[in-house]
């Protein structure tokens, strides 16, 4: 495994989440134990497009980052750790749960560790 592969894996996972938010918001939110109101669906669609943009960035970073590649890996490690913390907080507060929340919690933790470890190896 290398940092380029971690970016690509993260990009594919982001595409899955982005498409889920954009086209299957009701199901996506129901799986997180949230009531899918029209307003939440609208925010979810906007967030879905944003996540799709992040997926595109994650896919392209290995090809365009140059000397900053390792630093960007470390930055993404921090970002995934932040997502892990906010998802964990929402689960603990009872604001999210179900398969969506727990699977994403595990995925964010794994990706944070992989980004950190692989970016250190790339230095």
Please place each PLM-identified region on the residue numbering.
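Membrane-interface helix-boundary motifs at transmembrane edges
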Residues: 1-3, 62-69, 95-97, 123
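Membrane-helix boundary elements
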Residues: 3-6, 14-41
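Residues within membrane-spanning alpha-helices of integral membrane proteins
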Residues: 7, 11-14, 48-51, 73, ...
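Core segments of alpha-helical transmembrane spans in multipass integral membrane proteins
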Residues: 16-22, 40-62, 75-82
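Membrane-embedded alpha-helical segments of multi-pass transporters/permeases
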Residues: 22, 59, 88, 112-116
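Non-cytosolic membrane-interface motifs at loop->transmembrane helix junctions
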Residues: 33-41, 70-71, 96-106
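Membrane-helix boundary connector in multi-pass membrane proteins
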Residues: 63, 85-102, 120-121
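Membrane-water interface at the C-terminal end of transmembrane alpha helices
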Residues: 109-123
């Amino acid at each position: 495994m290398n940092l380029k592969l971690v970016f690509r894996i993260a990009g594919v996972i982001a595409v899955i989440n982005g498409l889920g938010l954009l086209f299957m918001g009701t199901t996506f939110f129901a799986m997180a134990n949230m009531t899918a109101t029209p307003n939440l669906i609208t925010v979810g669609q906007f967030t879905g497009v944003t996540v799709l943009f992040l997926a595109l960035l994650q896919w392209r970073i290995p090809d365009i980052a140059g000397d900053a590649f390792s630093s960007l890996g470390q930055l993404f490690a921090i970002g995934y750790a932040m997502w892990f913390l906010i998802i964990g907080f929402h689960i603990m507060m009872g604001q999210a749960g179900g398969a969506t929340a727990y699977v994403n919690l595990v995925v964010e933790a794994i990706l944070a560790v992989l980004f950190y470890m692989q970016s250190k190896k790339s230095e």
